[in-house]
Amino acid sequence: MPSHKTFQIKKKLAKKMRQNRPIPYWIRMRTDNTIRYNAKRRHWRRTKLGF
């Protein structure tokens, strides 16, 4: 990834950064909740974004 990024790439990276976080604590505490963790977590070294 070059140090000079285009704005489009930067926006995509920012979105992926936001997606790559654990689910909020209060969502797990809700009644009838079956979601235990974020199944779509991505590790920076294991899985690359592909752009």
Swiss-Prot record:
GO molecular function: structural constituent of ribosome
Superkingdom, natural source: Eukaryota
Keywords: Ribonucleoprotein, Ribosomal protein
GO cellular component, one term: cytosolic large ribosomal subunit
GO-annotated biological processes: translation
Family indicated by similarity: Belongs to the eukaryotic ribosomal protein eL39 family.
Listed name of the protein: Large ribosomal subunit protein eL39x
